[in-house]
Amino acid sequence: MIGRMGIDDIQPLVSAGQYPAKCVVGELIPISATAWREGHDALGVTLHVETPYRTSFDVRMSPATEPDAFNAAIVPDAVGYWTFRIEAWSDPYATWRSAVTKKIDAGQGAEDLANDLETGARILGEAAQQVDGTDRQLLLDAVDSLRS
C-alpha cells in the first residue's frame, strides 16, 4: 500500500490564489511548499514549471530546515504567464539510503548488509532503465559496485 501524501502552504501565493504572483525577467523566484506522507518512507517533491513558450521543465525541490518543508527557485527568462505545480512522490532510493546509512552508523558491515545492498542494486537498476547515456552508465556502475 502506498501511503497518502499531502501538499500544503504553497508559496508564492497572492490573496489565496486569486491573483498571480508577479516578478520581473531575471528575478530569482523562491518557491516553497510543505509536503508530507503517512508512514516512514521518504518523500520526493518536484516543481513542474510551464513557461510562456509552451515548454515545461522539472526541478527537484530540496528539503528545508523545517520539518516537511521543501524549497526550489526559478529565474524567469521571458515576459509572460508562467505556471507551476508541485508534485509529491514516494522516493524508494532515499528510503533505502536512509535505512542503510543508519545500519552502517550502527556498525553493521557488508556481510550484515548483503540483502540491503542487493535491494539498493535493484532500485538503481530500475532507475537505469529510465535514462540514457552517461546517467545510465553511472547507475549501472553503482549497481555493479553494490553487488561486488
What are these regions (language model features)?
Residues 5, 14-16, 23-77, 81-85:
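Catalytic cores of nucleotide-enabled group-transfer and carboxylate-activating enzymes in metabolic
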Residues 1-38, 97-131:
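Non-catalytic, glycine-rich low-complexity segments
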Residues 57, 62-148:
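Extended acidic/polar, glycine-enriched regions
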